């Protein structure tokens, strides 16, 4: 019995031990170990403790076969290790092999750079040394040097392309064969640099050893490098591969032996062999890879996290495979692409990618300069990344990935025709709650005729379907906010609840540029968006057609908010050449004519973009008021007519402009000629009314050959009620004989114009981003923003309560300051003797300058403003430097009347407003220095030479001009009938007899 019992216990223990062994062997076949590497170590050590570390990456690579799941290979912080870490072993799920760090201090550096030593003088300031490694780039104190090049700076330009094989530049006058073997770095498209070796040079023709991707054309920039005879400028180097000699002309002509120099030689910092699984790369600084910082192909569950990767020639990280994670890394100063992710079901989260592809010609050949490239990834989540300063596109996306809570700032810094996010081959992609801003567009080395084409979100010309773009803030991009290229395969696109703000051409654009043929309709949904423009040149939305004269129905547009405080025309439709036409719509017209955006709204805020600080000329328009005739004005073509008429809503005479549609595609009404100067500013104002509603253009028309418009046209509206317009015009050409021109394109149009003024002025730009302020929360937590005591309004016009606003994560809010940015306003009533008619109680309008002065001697000027008083004598003037509750003298200056001051003691602003009326009582004027006409008090006329008195010198000026029958807008014309005559002389003579002078404190 005892024997049987013993056998039973023996059998029990056998099975128990077998189970334990089986469990341990399946859970962890070999116990994991930690290995240490330190600059103070030795490769003869066992590496398994901090006190017995290895010292080189070479040793780590040699031991790779011994590593097992769960092992940690740790590099000491603060140390630097040279070489390429080659990972060939896999871990297990939850038991990965980890390559990381230990200790304290800066991340350990795995560098692909060596420091060339033992430099000797080659010639002059050029040094040389033997260098046996293949190198790609040279750095001094962290700054990249140039490969010896021609020209030493700037660019040469192609004259014409020779298909895909080369180009011609007649300026290349070197002997045949001179450029053979050189490298040519050339821009071949807006979006592309290519790098090719010259196989043959002859008589200005450059032939490449292999074809470029993009056929070459006229006026693209290029330079040659990589020849020893080009080494003639500091900061350049040349590497002679056959002879293994490195030549260098150091910055400042310094001795390279005294400098910190790094030559990039290792192809990778970390290379994971194909098929490797379950490996973590963490807490390392990977630097100076000749190709990529981290490279992997077709592996599974590779994680790269908390690393810093810098100065790679091509990619910071490139991972292909399944289940990879790229998280919380800093990738910076990579010459081509920050991250390339061709992965399935991956995660790219929390990375900061800065300054990628910013050295022209040194990035990828034909395609590159990108922050994050993931257009071939599938099922990958891309979240909480920051892309700052990319040579080309910030993100390149496709398939069915999710990109949300990312910040993309400053893209297209080196190239053009791209944007913050570019998409291709989409089926299920979601772009949500990102902040995309400042796509620049660089045309420096592209043909001068090319346009800036920089976008927030850019649709490629590939199949795109089942796409969601929602909740994004897209701002300050130099061309278009969202560019929708409607190919024939575009399907099920949703653009919802985005904020598009201050994108320089249009907030959103729909085009059929890449369609194979006309398609009548698309099922895109565009709803709930804010399209906020900040310039009269910008529109909220544009529809463009290339393939038909009939517009496609680009989708369902509704419940959007359109705003442009500087232009009421917020939607544009264009038929592209050869049958070009363009029409801009106000929202009401868009709704009624097109039938879209029926529940959308338009902002009622309206602002000026400039404040006039000084008027530098008299009115250039010789007949601005049409009191008697339309002299000085002409019209064209034959179907157009102009006539002087009296319109009850305008001020006496006006000019009627009518066109029956005959003679041309539009009519013109043309003023007298006047000089304009490129870059100067001119204030234009006018009053208009129509018998019905319609549109008209205004522009400066040039007299110069091949120059038609002096700057872009402006489109305005005439209605059955009076509208007064004023704007600042900045010509882009100097012209001795510009004309103020209006035009109508719609036949049977008719409107009336009056009070046409054009003055040369000094201006101060009013910051439109402060008037309509965008508050962006770029964090993952709700943020509070102080309003700094400014009274803002919401977009619906309601007041913002309190001094703090709450903005949710990765979102934005636009608030409007319609309080003139707290600009004090003087509402002034004044009349000038010669211009005022007491019978009609109307005056001719004219320009007036007002100084606000200190009330204490010497009465210094505190601020000034310029305005035009209307036919009632009212002018509104904005000031910048005055405060409520402080008394100021009001000093009024008019071109041919005596300067006039407000009454003794001064006046003060209240709530930034001061109302002052010189016309009701003489006591409102300092020294009662006014003349009564009818029931009103007027400033004395006649101080033509502005010397402070109406006297003989003024009479002499008027008499001389009257004798020559002078006409036009002249200071001598005191009653403003455009004729200097006895009537003007009489006014001045009476005031001279009464010794009228300026009376001031």
Feature annotation, model-predicted:
Residues 604-639, 767:
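Extracellular carbohydrate-recognition regions
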Residues 641-665:
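Short carbohydrate-recognition loop motifs
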């Amino acid at each position: 019995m005892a024997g049987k019992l013993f056998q039973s216990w023996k059998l029990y223990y056998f099975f128990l031990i077998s189970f334990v062994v089986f469990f341990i062997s399946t859970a962890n076949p070999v116990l994991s170990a930690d290995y240490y590497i330190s600059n103070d170590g030795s490769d003869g050590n066992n590496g398994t403790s901090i006190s017995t570390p290895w010292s080189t990456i070479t040793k780590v690579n040699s031991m790779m076969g011994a590593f097992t799941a769960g092992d940690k290979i740790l590099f000491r912080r603060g140390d630097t290790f040279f070489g390429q870490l080659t990972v060939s072993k896999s871990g297990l799920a939850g038991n990965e092999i980890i390559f990381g760090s230990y200790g304290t201090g800066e991340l350990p550096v795995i560098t692909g750079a060596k420091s060339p030593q033992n430099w000797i003088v080659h010639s002059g300031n050029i040094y040389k040394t033997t260098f046996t490694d293949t190198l790609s780039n040279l750095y001094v104190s962290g700054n990249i040097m140039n490969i010896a090049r021609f020209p030493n700076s700037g660019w040469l330009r192609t004259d014409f392309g020779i298909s895909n094989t080369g180009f011609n530049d007649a300026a290349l006058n070197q002997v045949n064969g001179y450029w053979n073997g050189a490298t040519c770095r050339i821009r071949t498209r807006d979006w592309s640099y290519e790098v090719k070796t010259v196989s043959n040079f002859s008589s200005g023709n450059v032939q490449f050893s292999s074809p470029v991707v993009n056929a070459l054309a006229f006026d693209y920039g290029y330079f040659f490098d990589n020849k020893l005879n080009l080494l003639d400028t500091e900061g350049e180097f040349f590497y002679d591969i056959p002879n293994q000699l490195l030549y260098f002309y150091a910055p400042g002509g310094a001795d390279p032996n005294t400098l910190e120099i790094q030559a990039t030689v290792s192809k990778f910092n970390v290379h994971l062999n194909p098929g490797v699984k379950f490996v973590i790369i963490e807490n390392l600084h990977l630097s100076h890879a000749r190709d990529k910082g981290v490279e992997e192909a077709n592996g599974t569950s590779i994680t790269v996290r908390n690393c810093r990767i810098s100065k790679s020639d091509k990619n910071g990280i490139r991972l292909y495979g399944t289940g990879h994670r790229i998280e919380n890394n800093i990738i910076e100063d990579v010459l081509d692409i920050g991250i390339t992710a061709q992965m399935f079901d991956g995660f790219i989260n929390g990375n900061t990618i800065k300054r990628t592809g910013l050295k022209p010609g040194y990035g990828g050949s034909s395609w590159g300069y990108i922050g994050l490239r993931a257009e071939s990834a599938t099922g990958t989540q891309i979240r909480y990344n920051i892309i700052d300063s990319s040579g080309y596109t910030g993100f390149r996306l496709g398939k069915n990935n999710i990109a949300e809570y990312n910040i993309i700032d400053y893209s297209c810094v080196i190239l053009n025709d791209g944007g913050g996010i570019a998409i291709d081959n989409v089926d299920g992609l979601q772009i949500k709650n990102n902040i995309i801003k400042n796509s620049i567009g660089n045309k420096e080395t592209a043909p001068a005729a090319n346009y800036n084409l920089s976008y927030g979100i850019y649709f490629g010309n590939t199949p795109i379907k089942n796409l969601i773009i929602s909740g994004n803030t897209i701002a300050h991009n130099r061309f278009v906010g969202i560019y929708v290229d409607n190919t024939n395969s575009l399907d099920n696109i949703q653009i919802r609840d985005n904020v598009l703000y201050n994108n320089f051409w249009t907030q959103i654009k729909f085009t059929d540029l890449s369609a194979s043929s006309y398609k009548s309709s698309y099922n895109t949904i565009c709803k709930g968006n804010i399209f906020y423009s900040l310039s009269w040149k910008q529109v909220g939305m544009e529809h463009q057609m290339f393939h038909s004269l009939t517009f496609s129905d680009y989708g369902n547009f509704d419940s959007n908010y359109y705003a442009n405080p500087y232009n009421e025309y917020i939607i544009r439709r264009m038929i592209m050449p050869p049958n070009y036409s363009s029409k801009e719509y106000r929202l009401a017209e868009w709704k009624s004519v097109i039938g879209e955006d029926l529940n959308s709204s338009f902002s009622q805020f309206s602002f000026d973009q400039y404040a006039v600080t000084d008027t530098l000329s008299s009115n250039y328009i010789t007949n601005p008021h049409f009191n008697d005739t339309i002299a000085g004005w002409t019209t064209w073509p034959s179907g157009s007519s102009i006539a002087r008429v009296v319109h009850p809503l305008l001020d006496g005479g006006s000019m009627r402009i009518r066109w029956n549609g005959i003679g041309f595609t539009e009519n013109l009404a043309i003023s007298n000629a006047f000089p304009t100067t490129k870059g100067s500013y001119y204030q234009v104002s006018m009053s208009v009314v129509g018998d019905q509603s319609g549109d008209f253009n205004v522009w400066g028309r040039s007299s110069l050959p091949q120059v038609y418009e002096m700057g872009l046209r402006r489109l305005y509206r005439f209605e059955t009620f009076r509208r007064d317009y004023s704007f600042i015009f900045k010509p882009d050409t100097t012209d001795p004989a510009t004309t103020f021109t209006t035009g109508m394109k719609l036949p049977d149009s008719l409107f009336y114009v009056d009070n046409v003024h054009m003055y040369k002025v000094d201006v101060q730009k009013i910051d439109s981003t402060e008037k309509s302020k965008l508050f962006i929360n770029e964090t993952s937590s709700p943020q509070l923003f102080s309003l700094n005591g400014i009274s803002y309004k919401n977009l619906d016009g309601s007041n913002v309560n309190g001094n703090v606003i709450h903005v949710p994560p990765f979102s934005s809010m636009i608030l409007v300051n319609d309080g003139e940015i707290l600009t004090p306003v003087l509402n002034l009533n004044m009349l000038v003797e010669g211009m005022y008619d007491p019978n009609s109680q109307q005056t001719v309008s004219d320009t007036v300058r007002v100084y606000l002065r200190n009330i204490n001697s010497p009465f210094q000027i505190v601020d000034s403003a310029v305005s035009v008083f209307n036919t009632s004598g009212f002018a509104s003037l904005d000031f910048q430097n005055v405060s409520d509750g402080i008394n100021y003298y009001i000093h009024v200056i008019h071109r041919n009347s005596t300067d006039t001051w407000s009454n003794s003691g001064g006046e003060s602003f209240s709530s930034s407003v001061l109302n002052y009326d010189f016309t009701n009582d003489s006591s409102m004027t300092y020294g009662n220095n006014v003349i009564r006409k009818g029931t009103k008090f007027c400033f004395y006329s006649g101080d033509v030479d502005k010397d402070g008195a109406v006297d003989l010198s003024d009479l002499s000026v008027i008499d001389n001009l009257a004798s020559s029958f002078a006409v036009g807008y002249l200071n001598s014309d005191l009653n403003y009938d455009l004729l200097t005559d006895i009537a003007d002389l009489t006014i001045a003579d009476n005031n001279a007899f009464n010794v009228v002078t300026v009376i001031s404190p």
